[in-house]
Amino acid sequence: MPTLRRLDISEFRNLRSATLQPGEGINLISGENGSGKTSILESISVLAHGRSFRTHKFRRLINNDEKSFTLFGQIFEGTTRNIGLSRASNGDIQIRIDSKAAHTATELAECLPLLVMNSASFQLLEGSGQVRRKFFDWLVFHVKQEFKHYWKLYARCIKQRNSLLRRDKITRSELLPWDQELTKAAQHIESMRSEVFELFQTHFLNEIGQFDFTETLGAELSCTYVSGWSKTGNYNEQLEDQFERDVAAGYTHIGSHKSDVKINLARVPAVEELSRGQQKSVIVALFLAEALVFRTTTGRTPVFLLDDLPAELDEKNLRIVGKALKNLGSQVFATAIDPKSILTGWELVDDESLRMFHVKHGQVELKNDITLRDSFLL
């Protein structure tokens, strides 16, 4: 399994200079609000994805007194790989993998598959289909090598088609060549998504069944993949039927860019019926299902970044999550203001493989002496 064995952070937010040597299992990061513990998770995300899970404005990632930040990671997966990323305030970005220049963040993502769960993850239930589609496509991207090719082709066709739709007096015949290419790409995308979703759905239902609250619900919790067009007909023919509507709006209404993963209780969106704690359990089950399908199909396990996991989870459900992560075998980075709930709930007090880090005013300190853990339990 891929694990991050070393992390060097320079001028990233309030972390002026920090070096971490994480363990291959649980890495627990504690600290007060604003101390910088979430920034550690964020730096790993930027290093692995090329982007932050907190902001789209990269200048906010650079320490106020500096003109750039630099991140370096050492990944072990049978052999050691070195990855690095630097970003300057003028927008310049440098990515290096094993001392060679890389051109896209996709190459980083392939080195270190990463799942990030934080407060924004509630958008998987509260947000639009785009949020869930992006979440699910992470899995399809990693387990189906051809997906990237067909998605890029599809995106190019949609962009060109929408551009033509906004032109004066566009005819159906002018769109036809693009529609044919769009249809081919969409069929491949839907085929791959459907195949992966069968596995995902099975694992999700198994994982959510571990939480007791599902037995008290008045209806069955379901997870369904919904295509972006009607499955009763040909996509190309449906594009033709939508022509006048698309011209009037200036964009394409149906297609793989409109697909969704629905989480319902009976026929009602689950978010409208479940408590905040129950929603958190559903979100955990979604992430665990992704990780399990990823492991089943690739033989690898993703790295988990869990920001303030204990929030909204009671002791029993937190224990269920800890057991599932242990069985999965993933490397985990988890933050908590008070690590007591994780230490006790996950039975980590005497675990010699645990790495504990404490962050204060941007300074990171290793708290790995097993005798020190009792101080967090007082």
Curated annotation (Swiss-Prot):
Subcellular compartments: Cytoplasm
Record key words, sorted: ATP-binding, Cytoplasm, DNA damage, DNA repair, DNA replication, DNA-binding, Nucleotide-binding, SOS response
Pfam family, one: SMC_N
Binding-site residues for ATP, renumbered to this chain: G31, E32, N33, G34, S35, G36, K37, T38
GO CC, alphabetical: cytoplasm
Main localization, broad class: cytoplasm
Classification via InterPro entries: DNA-binding_RecF, P-loop_NTPase, RecF/RecN/SMC_N, RecF_2
One GO BP: double-strand break repair
An example molecular function term from Gene Ontology annotations: ATP binding
NCBIfam families named in the record: recf (TIGR00611)
Family: Belongs to the RecF family.
Protein name from the UniProt record: DNA replication and repair protein RecF
Organism annotation: Teredinibacter turnerae (strain ATCC 39867 / T7901)
